[in-house]
Design a protein with these regions (language model features):
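Extracytoplasmic/periplasmic ligand-capture domains
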Residues: 1-9
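An acidic, gly/pro-interrupted, aromatic-rich
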Residues: 6, 13, 24-171
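Alpha-helical secondary-structure segments
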Residues: 11-21
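Helix-loop-helix junctions that connect adjacent transmembrane helices in secondary transporters/permeases
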Residues: 172-177
Length: 177
């Protein structure tokens, strides 16, 4: 990759194109064989859940909203600037109910095992039924126009949703759904 980057005169788009079109990057998470050694032999990649901070940042990015944070320690440096993302939270005392529910580490010990990456029923219910997520979708400036489009513009709305959420165009099969 180093030689390719230099040969392309440090063109990052060229480097991204090279990586994204490689077979390594396009591997499936499904093992090509029945045995359990697919992961060990790098024949597939293991799926893992997004960390709490990354997930809320993605939801805020999609909806155009921001998360509200609070701190149990009332000190001046617990104020969060509007443009700061959850992944940049340096102080573990600054948190939100979403971060706690989705397994953000309290950073008491500094061990990786403090973070919970398990998917729980409470997390599923929060994503499916919570007023928090509903307010982000319905109240977000990015989603408002897409929600209120008329039936005549249905195909255009679906395309915009796919581009906003998945950064790709929908397939023909997805349009039919």
């Amino acid at each position: 990759l180093e030689h390719e980057l230099v040969a392309a005169r440090y063109d990052l788009k060229h480097l991204f194109r090279l990586i994204l079109n490689s077979t390594t990057y396009q591997r499936s998470h499904i093992s090509p064989t029945e045995d359990s050694q697919g992961e060990e032999n790098f024949a597939c990649y293991p799926l893992r859940r997004l960390e709490a901070e990354v997930l809320i940042d993605a939801l805020c990015q999609i909806s155009g909203t921001r998360e509200q944070y609070s701190s149990i320690i009332p000190e001046p440096y617990t104020f969060m600037p509007e443009d700061q993302r959850s992944v940049a939270l340096a102080d573990a005392s600054i948190t939100s109910p979403f971060l706690e529910k989705f397994g953000r580490s309290s950073r008491d010990t500094g061990l990786e095992s403090d973070r919970s990456d398990r998917t729980t029923a409470a997390q599923r219910l929060h994503l499916l039924n919570s007023s928090h997520i509903r307010q982000k979708i319905e109240g977000g400036p990015k989603m408002q126009p897409l929600i209120h489009w008329s039936r005549e513009k249905n195909e255009e709305a679906v395309t915009e949703l796919y581009l906003t959420i998945l950064s790709r165009f929908p397939t023909e099969e997805e349009f039919e759904i």
